[in-house]
């Protein structure tokens, strides 16, 4: 049976371990997306090779958001034109997952980067992205 240390050492099982990390701690590392949606698009990846967000253990959950916040602050210090972020996880093939190692997208947004950002993550189903307050009352 594998111990926790062995789980953290299964680096050859994930594509991400060959990429250039620019920040890491005991639980997560950060790297730039190879196909960025916007400049400085960052991936937050657990050190432990897991596939789903729902496999994070309680300690990883506790450490995820401080690490995410740290990456947000790095982006803001590098590019003050960033005014917003999209945060996303494609958890499962039907959600668009193509890499079988959990990773969280931190996508910096800037004024005017698209004509109308309304709906944000609702754009995963294009017909649902645009809506009005009237639509919400239905």
Residue ranges and their predicted role:
Residues 43-65:
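Short histidine-centered catalytic/ligand-binding loop motif
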Residues 47, 91-111:
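Histidine-centered catalytic micro-motifs
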Residues 9-13, 96, 108-138:
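Conserved His + Asp/Glu catalytic blocks
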Residues 60-78:
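Long, well-ordered alpha-helical scaffolding segments within enzyme catalytic domains
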Residues 1-8:
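Short, small-residue-biased leader/transition segments that mark boundaries at the very start
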Residues 17-36:
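Short beta-strand/loop segment at the start of cytosolic alpha/beta domains
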Residues 80-92:
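A short glycine-rich, hydrophobically flanked beta-strand micro-motif that places a catalytic Asp/Glu
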């Amino acid at each position: 049976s594998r111990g926790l240390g062995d789980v953290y050492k299964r680096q050859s099982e994930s594509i991400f371990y060959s990429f250039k990390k620019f920040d890491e701690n005991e639980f997560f590392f950060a790297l730039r997306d190879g196909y960025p949606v916007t400049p400085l698009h960052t991936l937050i990846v657990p050190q432990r090779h897991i596939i789903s967000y729902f496999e994070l253990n309680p300690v990883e959950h506790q450490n995820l958001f401080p690490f995410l916040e740290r990456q947000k602050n790095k982006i803001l210090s590098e590019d003050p034109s960033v005014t917003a972020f999209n945060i996303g996880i494609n958890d499962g093939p039907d959600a668009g997952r193509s890499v079988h190692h959990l990773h969280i997208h931190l996508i910096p947004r800037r004024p005017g980067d698209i004509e109308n950002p309304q709906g944000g993550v609702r754009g995963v189903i294009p017909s649902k992205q645009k809506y009005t307050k009237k639509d919400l009352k239905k």
